[in-house]
């Protein structure tokens, strides 16, 4: 476990109007909570997209013809890392605002809590976590619960939120 201050560069871009979206500072807080104790320096990008862009990306990269809530693209860096790279590049997270809003409403969650959960989820993917089988999924979900609890956010996997 890595302790100490985190140096974090989170670039956020929007592919749609920013209405009803969390502030950039919120995304940075959620990423920092995920990285705490795991990594001290990181550079990543978060892009908030509409359904059309979300669907196109999901089709292009996963061959699934629908928009999904979050996609993570871990950075593919050469080994050894270039000396000029002072902050490790983690990768990119793409979040589809209409899907996230729809899911939050269907699940009775606050929009902010759902964005927090999916930001944590996407960041964990950038760190190498997956949910390809039940064991991996259980471990990842437990870690998400712990991180979100530290942020004061309820268990996102409860049936009633």
UniProtKB/Swiss-Prot annotation:
GO terms for molecular function: metalloendopeptidase activity; RNA endonuclease activity; zinc ion binding. It is an enzyme of class 3 (hydrolase). GO terms for cellular component: cytoplasm. Its cofactor is Zn(2+). Zn(2+) binds at residues 121, 125, 131. Transmembrane segments: none annotated. Binds 1 zinc ion. Keywords: Cytoplasm, Endonuclease, Hydrolase, Metal-binding, Nuclease, Ribosome biogenesis, rRNA processing, Zinc. Its main location: cytoplasm. Single strand-specific metallo-endoribonuclease involved in late-stage 70S ribosome quality control and in maturation of the 3' terminus of the 16S rRNA. This is Endoribonuclease YbeY. It is found in: Cytoplasm. Belongs to the endoribonuclease YbeY family. GO terms for biological process: rRNA processing. It comes from Xylella fastidiosa (strain 9a5c). Its EC number is 3.1.-.-. InterPro entries: MetalPrtase_cat_dom_sf_prd, YbeY, YbeY_CS. It comes from the Bacteria.
